[in-house]
């Protein structure tokens, strides 16, 4: 067989296609599928209960899994990741660093079915073994990285690898990212304080709907607007300033990806770690409010070592895997399965964050104690003069099922973002929450927890300004930005009396504030007055 021979393209069927949240339920309802998966994966069904067999399949299937994405045509940016296991032939194909064949997913419109195509990668003679490449494996990779990537099929002990973390060089901060082009000439930034009609261009419907302050009015002409409140990224500040002959206000900062991208956020936050705390061998978070986080793209060997060292010490090993730059709960997985984590890293660039296994829970009527997290709105008016504010009113997000360290595929148990799905959504005003929280978790005072949250937020933004772009957030005279910080509360039981500490989950740029507007119709009046008119009094903000 020759690689360019069109006669040697073979179709491989998929034995099972599913989404991760439905896998266990499908197996529980289909005995024939269970038997077939046991046969494909060489799992013995004797001397094991039905539940044990299914759990073995769910663990072992990560040596066989592959995936593809189906885009949601009704909701931009939303998708479904489908996982599949090939038929008996496809699942028997071994991996090799010198593969003889290539394999790719193939969607056939005729029957609306997904298959895999197999075709020779090199000249192959009769009797040679059909092999495919290890995912992500390249000859240029280090031996440690190769061992980590091959782990699902060739398990090895990597615990001797140094799992301490260091800050990558500037190339990493620039890799795959657009750098902003800033004006070189000195342009004037017009003051808006005495401007009777402030022209605002926005592509956010909520801003147009809820902004009632008569000093602001909407315009469709971007080049004539005083303020650009944008959903899309702006990279060429220079050309826009030149076309206007003056500077402008815009709802973003140069290089703010160091806060938004989860891999960079972890790097930035580690700058807040005190020297006497910076000992990763204690297996403590550093800083305490940042979950231990590894980039699975560049730190996979270190992560595997850290995982195996925790395992040897009988420490819990539950992790949450998140894409670098997605939000709204998309493509996020909770697991304690090392093979699964490594295979997830093939799907897209991801981080593995230590899962908060002892969260502060909240009673939900007719349900029980559920997981919750908090969304705080943070306003950055200047990074150079460090003008930072937090909106006093936060909002709550609750899981729908009682929390426990099991059933990690159960979205309603382990996740709280329900407003982009068909799951029930519980809503509560923050002032009502505080009263009930102090009642449930007495003697803990919300004011003490709030002070910790505010200090954490300030530390995050200080850390982001410690380096020049692209390793730190940049400065532009007209930059004003709003960020949504997702925070969870965690028990610290290392004291005589348990303490409650905040833990950062992620930072979102220009967050969805529809719920904030529904709760507080004056929300955008407050936000824009603080950012662009320097008004603080009566605007429900605290300066940090």
Model-derived segments and spans:
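Conserved N-proximal alpha/beta basic substrate-recognition cap immediately N-terminal to
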Residues: 201-318, 325-327, 334-337, 343
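Surface-exposed beta-strand-to-loop junctions
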Residues: 108, 190-191, 239-249, 284-288, ...
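Catalytic cores of histone-lysine modification enzymes
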Residues: 1-100
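Conserved beta-strand elements of beta-rich interaction domains across eukaryotes
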Residues: 2-6, 15-19, 23-25, 32, ...
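Short amphipathic alpha-helical molecular recognition features
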Residues: 81, 85, 116, 122, ...
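C-terminal SET catalytic tail plus cysteine-rich post-SET Zn-binding segment of SAM-dependent SET-domain
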Residues: 97-197, 510
């Amino acid at each position: 067989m020759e690689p360019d021979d069109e006669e040697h393209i073979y179709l491989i069927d998929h034995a099972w296609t599913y989404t991760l949240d439905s896998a266990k339920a499908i197996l529980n309802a289909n005995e024939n599928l269970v038997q077939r998966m046991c046969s494909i994966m060489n799992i013995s069904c004797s001397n094991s209960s039905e539940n044990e067999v299914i759990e073995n399949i769910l663990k072992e299937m990560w040596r066989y899994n592959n995936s593809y994405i189906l885009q949601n045509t009704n909701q931009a940016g939303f998708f479904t990741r489908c996982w599949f296991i090939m038929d008996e032939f496809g699942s028997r194909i071994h991996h090799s660093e010198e593969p003889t064949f290539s394999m790719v997913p193939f969607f056939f419109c005729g029957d609306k079915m997904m298959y895999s195509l197999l075709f020779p990668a090199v000249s192959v003679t009769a009797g040679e073994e059909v092999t495919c490449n290890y995912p992500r494996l390249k000859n240029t990779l280090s031996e440690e990285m190769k061992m980590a990537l091959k782990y699902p099929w060739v398990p090895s002990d990597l615990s001797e690898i140094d799992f301490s973390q260091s800050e990558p060089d500037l190339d990493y901060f620039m890799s795959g990212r657009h750098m902003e082009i800033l004006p070189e000439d000195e342009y004037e930034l017009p003051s808006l304080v005495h401007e009777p009609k402030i022209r605002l261009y926005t592509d956010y419907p909520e801003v147009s709907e809820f902004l009632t302050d008569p000093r602001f009015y909407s315009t469709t002409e971007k080049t004539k607007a005083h303020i650009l409140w944008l959903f899309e990224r702006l990279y060429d500040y220079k050309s826009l300033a030149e076309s206007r002959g003056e500077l402008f206000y815009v709802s973003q900062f140069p290089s703010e990806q160091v806060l938004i991208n989860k891999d960079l956020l972890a790097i930035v936050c580690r700058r807040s770690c005190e020297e006497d705390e910076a000992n990763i061998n204690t297996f403590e978070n550093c800083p305490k409010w940042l979950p231990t986080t590894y980039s699975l793209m560049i730190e996979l060997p270190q992560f595997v070592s850290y995982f195996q060292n925790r395992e040897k010490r009988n420490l819990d090993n539950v992790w949450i895997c998140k894409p670098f730059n997605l939000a709204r709960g998309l493509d996020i997985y909770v697991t304690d399965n090392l093979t699964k984590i490594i295979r997830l890293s093939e799907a897209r660039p991801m981080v593995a964050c230590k899962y908060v296994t002892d969260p502060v829970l909240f009673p939900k009527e007719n349900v029980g104690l559920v997981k919750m997290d908090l969304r705080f709105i943070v306003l950055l008016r200047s990074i150079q003069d460090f003008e930072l504010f937090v909106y006093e009113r936060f909002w709550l997000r609750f899981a729908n099922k009682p929390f426990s360290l099991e059933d990690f595929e159960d979205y309603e148990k382990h996740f709280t973002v329900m407003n982009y799905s068909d799951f029930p959504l519980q809503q509560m005003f923050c002032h009502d929450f505080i009263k009930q929280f102090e009642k449930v978790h007495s003697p803990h005072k919300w004011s003490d927890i709030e002070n910790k949250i505010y200090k954490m937020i300030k530390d995050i933004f200080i850390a982001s300004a410690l380096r020049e772009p692209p390793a730190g957030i940049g400065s532009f005279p007209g930059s004003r930005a709003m960020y949504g910080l997702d925070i969870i509360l965690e028990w610290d039981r290392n004291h005589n009396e348990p303490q409650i500490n905040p833990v950062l989950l992620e930072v979102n740029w220009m967050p969805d504030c529809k719920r904030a507007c529904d709760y507080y119709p004056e929300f955008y009046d407050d936000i824009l007055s603080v950012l662009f008119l320097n008004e603080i009094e009566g605007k429900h903000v605290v300066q940090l």
